[in-house]
Amino acid sequence: MPVKVVSPYGSWASPITADIIVAGGLSFSEIRVDGDDVYWLEGRPAEAGRSVVVRRSMDGQERDQIPAGFNVRTGVHEYGGGVYAVGSGTIYFANWEDQRIYQVEENASPQVLTGLPEIARGDRYADLTIKDRKSTRLNSSHALTS
């Protein structure tokens, strides 16, 4: 057993470092079911906090549905809240970098659905849902007025 050492408050070396705290593990949120597939949003600290939609198919295979270069996150709720929707195998998501909505299907590149706002990142989307096979969303617009 190690010998106990009494030290003044704040003067001892802690085995818990900042690197240990921020390293963290993966986070999982926004679980969705589409047919036999299960989807979730996976936060990845090792990828600068990037969030990716992952699909688990009926055969147990897990696969990223969003390619590198995209971060599924919205500026409306910042860290979550209806940032993607899935229906009939098609995923609709908000991308952090430009706050635009994209559509992606299995083995395809994401296709942008919304235009460029007048102000960079000025339009923000959240609470994505699918109704009658169409993606609907809440739009929060940030504009300059004079």
What are these regions (language model features)?
Residues 34, 49, 87-88, 96-97, ...:
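Short loop/turn segments that connect beta-strands within the blades of beta-propeller domains
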Residues 134, 138-146:
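Single conserved hydrophobic/aromatic residue that forms the stacking wall/gate
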Residues 46-54, 98-103:
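Structural motif
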Residues 91-96, 116-128:
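Hydrophobic alpha-helical hairpins/lids featuring a short glycine-rich hinge
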Residues 38-42, 92-94, 135-137:
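Residue position within the beta-strands of beta-propeller blades
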Residues 2-27, 57-80, 104-124:
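Multi-bladed beta-propeller domains
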